């Protein structure tokens, strides 16, 4: 009975020993499991770090790929811009060819019109000549008929006198033959009477001679008249030739003006395009800088938030498992989240304010454009008013012309007598000389104006050449900038090669990491095999524990050996982990070095940008200096030209005065010759008068002698008283006739004296006027000499100034050459910018399509984000459930023995991991919210960009319409100018005809034209200012386009970053789910183990 009890006691002891060993083995197993879990957790953390590194590498690769894609896109855009610039240049060349063809056609038509006008003018001149010749011949015929009539009358009178004398002679002869006896006594009387008859015949012959002289004088005067008429005709022909020359000059001036206007329009269009491009570039750069600043602010906020989140995570790790601290941290996070939301709202408000400011700027610019249009309309109305005024003046001039024509006809009708005709011709000659002088002065004025216009043309051509030089210098500067860009691209390529080398190093490290992971996996497999064997031994031990104690001891030893081996393997794994951590640190250091290199590259790019801006500022300063020097040069040149023009005018005036003096001298000579002729005629007339008086005295003496003879013969001839009475009666008749003739001759002589007195008075007045004109000419000559001296002094001063200006100009020319080189570079830059503009326009279209694609991608990302948020919520719910389960397990483990304290530590570590997962989930939520807000911002920015793009397109369309309208207006203006020129030619013809009596009107017209030219110059300056404003607007628009491009590229980059972040978060979520599944499986295992232990205890108690 005792032996079985002892056996039972021994068995109980053995069972107790076995239980103790079992408990020890269980503790060892738990330790090994805890160690295994630690290793698994470390392995998970290493896998996470590996994934993070892989994601970072992928992000860097994506960024590099994006950078390469951007470089490719920039190259493509550059090529597209170059193609577009080529197309634009081809269009410009085609348009220039079209303009040249139109101008050539216009010139041909104008030449044809001028030829037709010349033919018409020639026909009109020939008609006028024919009419004048007809009138001259008619006048000659009338004069000849009148002269013939006077001669016939004189001949009839002489024949009558001769007949009467013959009859008297025949009667005397009959009386003498009848009374020969009585004749002897009267023979003496007869001889005396015959002598008287001879004297009368001599006097008649003398009268005939006087008449012949008078006729000769008359013919001379008629010849002089004809000469004066021919001179008048020559003057009229000269006048017509002058009119034709004036017309030709006006036509040439109109052609030159049209050419200048066309060239100015082309230059202004090019300047508009350049300024529009520059304005666009500036606006885009401003928007880029603003967006960069905003981006920098957002990145700063993001970095601050990341730091705060890291600090919060460190605080959470330090706080451990305190729920109150978690709640406080959650509240803090919520407050920070609210702060971030407020900051985001403020940023959105700032963006809206900037958008409103941009809209206001756009509205102000539109208002300015409207004001400019109103100003142009006002100028147009002013021009129309001036046109109407000119039409009114033309109508007045035509009416005056008609009146002058009527007055001329009346004057021609009123020409009656020969003397009046002479006086009128003299007055007309004076008027024609005055008109000729006026015409010569006007001609000199027109020539000077023509010279000034030619000089202006030359100045404009020099300006065009200067602009072309500036263009070449700009092109050279653009080439230099292009070289700098190529150098930067080379440096970027070098950085890209360095990145590729870093990638290669990363790939090598990745391969090493994969090899170490494979080794780790092999160790894990060995551990799993050991665990499986332990489980097998445990099951065997549980079934055969009572029977096989010895085998259990052997197995225990083997397990201990295997545990030592596992510990050694774990130590080796730890060593490998440390080596992996070192490799990780090395990779992180390399990554930091790469980031530093990237920052250096960015800083180098920024420094290059700053250098470029400084270079642009230097170029602008040099441009300003060049413009100032050019303005000074132009001012000095203008002064020299004005002085030269004044000198030329004075020389012309001096030459004109000399010519006028020569003409006056010639006229004086002619007048002196005429005076000498008239004095000769007067002396001849006086001689004739003396001879007539002598004849009268002789006749009186003969009369007295005849009376004496008659008284002596009274006594002898009383029986013949009847006959003598009859003879006396006849003698009294002859006496009466003779006295009547003498009276007529006296009257003729008095008339001749009066006419000669009149001519002498007129000659005296002309001599007085000539003396006055000589005095005035001498005075003018003295004035001109004084003015010439002053002008020579001024010229010497001007020459000095010109010499100084040339010296300064040479100094400036050296600077200008340097500036021209820079300007050529800038011209090359402008060409590149034009090419980039063309590519940017195409790029805009591509960006529009890419924006649509990005919108679709954003919609997809929003859907994915919503799914991710839903999955995050589910994960958080799971994590909360696991947290509750873990807390229940911790309570159960507290009830268990104190030996399971290590399990509590492990559970606490798992709780910490869960908390980390919660923190990561919260971070992911915050990141998702940030991404959502950033997506909203990007959507707003994209919508704003679309609106701005639409506005830009509308403005570009409006500008294109305005340009088309301006071109149409220019074409219409060309037609109107042709019509105006034709009407102007007619007006000038009328004015030249009216300028015979209207000098003052012509001067007023010239003043009006000068005002018109001033107004046109003012208008052209206003047009230039408007064009400059348009150019600035276009430059600003180009800048905006560039900024929009950069914004779109940045949006693409941000979208890629968000996609990479989304992938990272999704990967983190997958890892958290895997960890949660692992924790659930561990909990299930613990539950099954606890159930098995409870069942075994129940079995043992039973």
From Swiss-Prot:
InterPro entries: Myosin_tail, XRCC4-like_C
UniProt cross-references to Pfam families, sorted A to Z: Myosin_tail_1
TM region(s), chain numbering: none
Source organism: Gallus gallus (Chicken)
Signal peptide coordinates: none
Coiled coil: 1-1102
Free-text note regarding domains: The rodlike tail sequence is highly repetitive, showing cycles of a 28-residue repeat pattern composed of 4 heptapeptides, characteristic for alpha-helical coiled coils.
Name of protein: Myosin heavy chain, cardiac muscle isoform
Keywords tagged on the record: Actin-binding, ATP-binding, Coiled coil, Cytoplasm, Motor protein, Muscle protein, Myosin, Nucleotide-binding, Thick filament
